[in-house]
């Protein structure tokens, strides 16, 4: 057993809520099955034993103190399925009522079947059409948009949307520039149409720039292969940190402003800006460029690190569990990441 394996946690982070299109964003208040059992996490002091770094260096540059790691048996499908089951229970519907399952992930357990198909089999959603979306840290927003489109076209009524990642197996644990950033986790939402015609998803914008794809890459994945038992250095997550920083602090304010203009919404009317949890410096500069108080930018990256497509639903769930969201609150969601991809969404809770 390696040093890393000893710190991989059985206590991964699951989250779930119910999201209704064209209606309030209704959230179940029953959290009996919200799974955050006793845990062991990899904190910054632990990372200092395997790479040349320390707690102060990591916190000052990223804001991260610790992150959850899979124990190797609890992979992306496992986490997504558990989040899905909790979301179904909180929404009060059965798995056989799902018309569709969309999983956003860049760290699938297998190439085929897709994570969504594996989740379908695990939870017994026998009627659901299933597919995955790879939009990196923007994935959850892209998946929500896709669910919305299917529902609006009358092709689905009830959709499970999940973001799930096991990034710990995609990281080069000898590279202090990247291994300090990422954690494992999952989140899921039930998306349904609500004919009350108030609240819900109001508007969204998305974008991509494939010409900048080399800025953030993962050219190999942690999938079992009898002909390739060890990963080459270039197969792990690699990124140009400065380029990603410039991209995020430029594109996110731009697409948020597009959303506000499109919906004729004043920035002061936004209760929270729920952004992908990448780096505290990125979030602080985005707030500054939008001329918004940083208190409107909730953060939990200090405890979970960058969980890619799972970060937004995890943060939304925490806000709700802490009774910080009320019916009618307007919230901006925004993701940004590899591809490059980005997006923003205005919802009413």
Q: Which ranges hold each PLM region?
A:
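Conserved catalytic cysteine-centered active-site region
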Residues: 57-78, 105-159, 288-315
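Flexible, glycine-rich active-site loops centered on histidine and acidic residues
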Residues: 152-186
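Phosphate/pyrophosphate-binding loops at sites that engage ATP/ADP/AMP, CoA/4′-phosphopantetheine
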Residues: 83-99, 254-271, 319-324
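Catalytic phosphate/nucleotide-handling subdomain of diverse soluble enzymes
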Residues: 314-334, 340-349
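Condensing-enzyme catalytic core mediating Claisen C-C bond formation in acyl metabolism
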Residues: 17-72, 175-246, 250, 254, ...
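Short terminal hydrophobic/aromatic SLiMs and anchors at protein ends
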Residues: 2, 13-15
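Acidic, glycine-rich active-site loops and adjacent beta-strand->loop/helix elements
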Residues: 34-36, 104-109, 135-138, 163-168, ...
